[in-house]
Amino acid sequence: MLYKEFDAATTPIEGRMLLEASAGTGKTYSLMRVLLRLLVEKGIELDRILVVTFTNAATDELSSRLRSNLTELIEQIRLNKSGSFNDLLDSWGEKKYSQDIILEKLQTALNKIDDAAIFTIHGFCQRILQDFVFSSKGNYDFEIGDDSNAKDKALSTFLRTNLPKAYPGYPT
């Protein structure tokens, strides 16, 4: 199947967006461009944008990259210099966006960077459960734990319990 090349600076950004591609193809780069465009072109506040990914490492990378992109873009505009955001600045210039308004939106986002909703799927679900526990009429005396070692513990217990029975003389 042939796919059209994705251009983060010009692709329409209305509605939902799914960005799917192989490793090393620039997904994070493109996602950051789309986020910056949502902030500037649509005036969406950073805490109103949801980014969901698979791993904790990816959430850390996205958060770090967003902070550095905002900082770098603000500096590029303030110093009126050429840089890695020329594509966006050219597009915004063609659309007659005011640099003062762009700077204000970007600085506001940078000031609220800790409110960015960048989660793993599990982290997002946990957040929803915590935020809406009362309206869900669910049990709010619950704890969300990490069961990542549960399988290893169960296997270890099973082997420790059953191997000596199956193989008398098996060292325990």
Tell where the protein language model's regions lie, with residue ranges:
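Residues immediately flanking
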Residues: 23, 34, 54-56, 121
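Conserved RecA-like ASCE P-loop NTPase motor core of nucleic-acid helicases/translocases
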Residues: 45-58
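Conserved glycine(s) of the Walker
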Residues: 26
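Short amphipathic alpha-helical segment within the helicase RecA-like ATPase core
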Residues: 61-65
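Short helix-terminating capping/connector loops at secondary-structure junctions
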Residues: 43-46, 111-112
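Conserved ATP-dependent motor core of P-loop NTPases, especially the RecA-like helicase ATPase domain
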Residues: 2, 12-16, 53, 70, ...
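Conserved pre-motif I regulatory segment
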Residues: 1-22, 33
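Walker A/P-loop NTP-binding motif
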Residues: 30-44, 67
